[in-house]
Swiss-Prot record:
Main location: cytoplasm
Name of the protein in its database record: ATP-dependent 6-phosphofructokinase
Species of origin: Spiroplasma citri
Binding residue positions for ATP: 12, 73-74, 103-106
Binding site for ADP: 155, 186-188, 214-216
Gene it is expressed from: pfkA
Entry keyword ATP-binding: yes
Active site: 128 (proton acceptor)
Keywords: Allosteric enzyme, ATP-binding, Cytoplasm, Glycolysis, Kinase, Magnesium, Metal-binding, Nucleotide-binding, Transferase
Amino acid sequence: MLKKIGILTSGGDSQGMNAAIAGVIKTAHAKGLETYIIRDGYLGLINNWIEVVDNNFADSIMLLGGTVIGSARLPEFKDPEVQKKAVDILKKQEIAALVVIGGDGSYQGAQRLTELGINCIALPGTIDNDITSSDYTIGFDTAINIVVEAIDRLRDTMQSHNRCSIVEVMGHACGDIALYAGIAGGADIISINEAALSETEIADRVAMLHQAQKRSVIVVVSEMIYPDVHKLAKLVESKSGYITRATVLGHTQRGGNPTAMDRYRAFQMAQFAVEQIIAGVGGLAIGNQGDQIIARPIMEALSIPRSSRKEIWAKFDQLNQNIYQKS
């Protein structure tokens, strides 16, 4: 009979992870189950950094950014011997089920543990929104709000000084942060991984905006496209006539209090995860589709192709080009 549930967060942190942790703890305790936190992800698991917690632990964490139980990356977890050690530790603690919050790598670890006898449920915790089995990942909403606020602030000062700002945002190989925040922030040019503009194209477009006498320009780009955005800024400046500066937002996108939407989604998914565990089901990835919380086998979730954002990007890009070409 199931008596104990474990929780770990793995990989890069994201806002809303603590709301998911709180959701697991509160739901499990309401069902009469003990909850155990595992410090620092899979690294903590193989080192037996496991602690029992109660509802008091969950009471004040939903508003906090990051993950209060810590996270770490552990490439060695792919090793079958390391996986076996993790299973042995969980079984010794009589923890028969685990909620894993993280990205693709965390999902793969959860799948392997499920195959070895520990029922695992995975929740999509990453600001990048690159878990294809879920419309939105935990932390994405907060991240794009942070980026929009940064764009707003940069626009103020660029407008004051008649300048151009290039803003590089996170996303790994997914352009959703740049696309969503760029559109919401009123960017003039957006370059994402699947619709990447060349450095020369960006410089030429900024030059056209200068010719159209636009007072300020905001360019939003995804990371991992351009080797050095500061050098890109120098190129843009040399070709456009604008003094141009680059801002790399970096890890500011992963910190701070989660938005209401991230807390809400994370808590809902956590509740659903515990319900699946109580039903005796493991090896599932939880996500959202529209307003619905859904579950899929982890391996199926990992195999879903990413939906293209090219059409959304193209409509926005064409609209902006029409505006400044007619100016």
